[in-house]
Amino acid sequence: MQNRIAKIERNTSETKVKIDINLDGTGLNKIHTGIGFLDHMLELFSFHSNTDVYLSCDGDLNVCDHHSVEDVGIIFGKAFKEALGDKKGINRYGTFFLPMDEVLSLISLDISGRGFLVFDCEFTREKVGELSTEMIEEFFRAFALNSEITLHCKVLYGKNDHHKIESLFKGFGRALRDAKERNELNKVPSTKGIL
């Protein structure tokens, strides 16, 4: 079978973002957004989803992290959608509970063709490293809308914001790995015939 790959660039007055992904990879990655903690979370996602990710973002971090984080989510979602192609033979659904020390999170998703996000997580800190915690939801929203997946993210319990965020990204990787996995049916997993 042919690897599912995509290469996209997005240039605005606020950011310049490039991504190259392989959904059938092994989790290789080289990621530079200028926001160290975001890089780390995307590396974890890449590893746990078995998706090769090469991503660079040159954004207006002198203003704040909003544009960079959102635009990375946008291009990531677009690349995922493009790489999936016609969606024949995928499992479609993925759900994963991910423990990270005292934190337990739930990620559930549907590669449905309908972009939607439910995000139920509270943070006590304004930032973890240089990443604004309010931007975690914005990243997942941008990814969900642009990849056209339905995505539910919930932290069930826990205190440490770093652990919460890491649990979400790892769980997202594992759920997406299951959903994008190919099966032997080689048909679109919908009674409608399309997703």
UniProtKB/Swiss-Prot annotation:
Which Gene3D superfamilies would you find in this protein's record? Imidazole glycerol phosphate dehydratase, domain 1 (3.30.230.40)
* Catalytic activity field: D-erythro-1-(imidazol-4-yl)glycerol 3-phosphate = 3-(imidazol-4-yl)-2-oxopropyl phosphate + H2O
Keywords for this entry?
Amino-acid biosynthesis, Cytoplasm, Histidine biosynthesis, Lyase
Q: CDD domains of this UniProt entry? A: IGPD (cd07914)
**Known InterPro entries for this protein?**
IGPD_sf, ImidazoleglycerolP_deHydtase, ImidazoleglycerP_deHydtase_CS, Ribosomal_Su5_D2-typ_SF
Q: Where in the cell is it found?
A: Cytoplasm
Q: Which organism is it from?
A: Clostridium botulinum (strain Alaska E43 / Type E3)
Q: Name one GO biological process term.
A: L-histidine biosynthetic process
The EC class name is: lyase
Primary residence? cytoplasm
Which SUPFAM superfamilies does the record cross-reference, listed alphabetically? Ribosomal protein S5 domain 2-like (SSF54211)
- E.C. numbers: 4.2.1.19
Q: What is this protein called?
A: Imidazoleglycerol-phosphate dehydratase
Query: What's an example GO cellular component term for this entry?
Result: cytoplasm
Going by the entry's taxonomy, the superkingdom of the source organism is recorded as Bacteria
Q: In which pathway does it act?
A: Amino-acid biosynthesis; L-histidine biosynthesis; L-histidine from 5-phospho-alpha-D-ribose 1-diphosphate: step 6/9
